[in-house]
């Protein structure tokens, strides 16, 4: 047994009375069996984090040697101001982990889903609406069109060969399976709204596919966090932190870990757009929609009303078109989808557009969107903004 392991065993034994909270899964939440996310305290150094992982590996080795079930650590997260990991652990191991004084909290690894509700055949209208204060049939935009901005689509994958992207889409990371493709069409539709040549807002932006949802449109919270972590690191490595946007048209039950991870992207300088959810309830109970620093987007209809399915509440920053939205589908062609999943990429696209046009950093883009927005939603829901997305075209 190494010195670091002995040291950590000693510290854990001394800290039982100060054990970190082991959160319960929200009622009705689908969770990964024996899956947990462990978040360290803010003041945990890289050295302390490394020592903790050595100690956890030692515990896991002892478990497997005794023939008990448990896969151990599967993913590690290392943001600027947040460190943690996820994995499969038995209850005794999780109890030991929670006793480490460097652990802030432990929560179940819940399943996250895409926010799409219906598909119909109908003409698009969202682009023209966001570029005209009182509505119109034409999409009016500046020729910069998101040039020089990177859009990370944290979703079900993207058909990067689709003609809508004209070679501007690339594969980034896969945190959920070994299929580098879009199994649901959701991510491709979202990407098309952000940056497609026909259906997109920021028509010159680069699209980066970050797959976190499987062919059923679901994925573990741990994988979503890993996708965010990868996106931040990739933007940093390429000098794009303040010229990048992230879209997450997904959500699930409240997760402190997911909210903390999403906030790290904002702190790093990246704009983040998330969908409010499709349950017609207060979005304060969902993640990542409830994270205050992100831009949470609810869905509007063609007549500037709240879409019947859209979540609402004080967490909502803006409304954007989310009903009967036409965009790209895998394999070529297009399809119509509805949902707050379709509203969020409208905001993400306008953010990318404004970053390129006005030179604002991504971390300030949500504020700029709210400054430009118009108070036209006529039935927004209790304690909810009336403001509708607008690109500032002057029309």
From Swiss-Prot:
**Pfam families assigned to the protein according to its UniProt record, in alphabetical order:** Inhibitor_I9, Peptidase_S8
EC number(s) from the headed UniProt entry? 3.4.21.-
**Annotated propeptide span(s):** 20-115
Q: Name one GO biological process term.
A: proteolysis
Query: Where on this protein are sugars attached?
Result: 229, 247, 391
Q: Where is the Peptidase S8 domain?
A: 124-395
Residues at the catalytic site: 155 (charge relay system), 186 (charge relay system), 341 (charge relay system)
Subcellular location(s) of the protein: Secreted
List the CDD domains: Peptidases_S8_PCSK9_ProteinaseK_like (cd04077)
Q: Which GO terms describe its molecular function?
A: serine-type endopeptidase activity
Q: Which residues form the signal peptide?
A: 1-19
Chain ranges of the Inhibitor I9 domain: 36-112
The source's superkingdom equals: Eukaryota
Entry keyword annotation includes Flavoprotein? no
Q: Which Gene Ontology cellular component terms are annotated?
A: extracellular region
Q: Annotated region Disordered: where?
A: 374-395
Q: Which UniProt keywords apply?
A: Glycoprotein, Hydrolase, Protease, Secreted, Serine protease, Signal, Virulence, Zymogen
Q: Which InterPro entries match?
A: PCSK9_ProteinaseK-like (IPR034193), Peptidase_S8/S53_dom (IPR000209), Peptidase_S8/S53_dom_sf (IPR036852), Peptidase_S8_Asp-AS (IPR023827), Peptidase_S8_His-AS (IPR022398), Peptidase_S8_Ser-AS (IPR023828), Peptidase_S8_subtilisin-like (IPR050131), Peptidase_S8_subtilisin-rel (IPR015500)
Q: Which family does it belong to?
A: Belongs to the peptidase S8 family.
PANTHER family to which the protein is assigned, alphabetical: CEREVISIN-RELATED, PEPTIDASE S8
Report the function annotation for this chain: Secreted subtilisin-like serine protease with keratinolytic activity that contributes to pathogenicity.
Protein name, entry field? Subtilisin-like protease 5
């Amino acid at each position: 047994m190494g010195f670091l392991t002995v040291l950590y065993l000693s510290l854990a034994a001394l800290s039982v009375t100060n054990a970190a909270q082991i959160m319960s899964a929200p009622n009705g939440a689908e969770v990964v069996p024996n899956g947990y996310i462990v978040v360290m305290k803010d003041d945990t150094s890289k050295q302390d984090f490394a020592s903790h992982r050595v100690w956890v590996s030692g515990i896991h080795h002892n478990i497997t040697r005794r023939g008990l079930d448990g896969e151990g650590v599967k993913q590690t997260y290392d943001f600027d101001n947040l460190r943690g990991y996820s994995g499969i652990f038995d209850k005794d191991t999780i109890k030991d982990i929670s006793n480490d004084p460097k652990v802030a909290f432990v929560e179940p690894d819940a399943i996250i889903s895409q926010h799409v509700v219906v598909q119909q055949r109908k003409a698009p209208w969202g682009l023209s609406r966001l570029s005209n204060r009182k509505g119109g049939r034409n999409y009016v935009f500046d020729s910069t069109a998101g040039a020089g901005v990177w859009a990370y689509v944290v979703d079900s994958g993207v058909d990067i060969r689709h003609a809508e992207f004209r070679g501007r889409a690339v594969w980034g990371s896969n945190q959920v399976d070994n299929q580098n493709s879009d199994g649901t069409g959701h991510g491709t539709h979202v990407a098309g709204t952000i940056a497609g040549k026909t259906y997109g807002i920021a028509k010159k932006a680069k699209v980066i596919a970050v797959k976190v949802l499987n062919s059923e449109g679901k994925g573990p919270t741990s994988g979503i966090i890993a996708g965010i972590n990868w996106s931040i690191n990739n933007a940093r490595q390429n000098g794009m932190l303040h010229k990048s946007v992230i879209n997450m048209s997904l959500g699930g039950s409240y997760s402190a870990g997911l909210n903390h991870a999403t906030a790290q992207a904002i702190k790093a300088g990246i704009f983040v757009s998330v969908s409010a959810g499709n349950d017609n309830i207060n979005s304060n109970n969902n993640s990542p929609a409830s994270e205050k620093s992100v831009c949470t987007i609810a869905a509007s209809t063609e007549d500037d009303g709240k879409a019947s399915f859209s979540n609402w509440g004080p967490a909502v920053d803006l409304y954007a078109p989310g009903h009967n939205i036409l965009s790209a589908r895998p394999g070529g062609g297009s399809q119509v989808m509805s949902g707050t999943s379709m509203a969020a990429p409208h905001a993400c696209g306008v953010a990318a557009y404004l970053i390129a046009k006005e030179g604002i950093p991504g971390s300030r883009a949500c504020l700029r969107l709210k400054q430009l927005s118009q108070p036209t939603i006529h039935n927004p829901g209790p304690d909810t903004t009336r403001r509708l997305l607008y690109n500032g075209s002057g029309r």
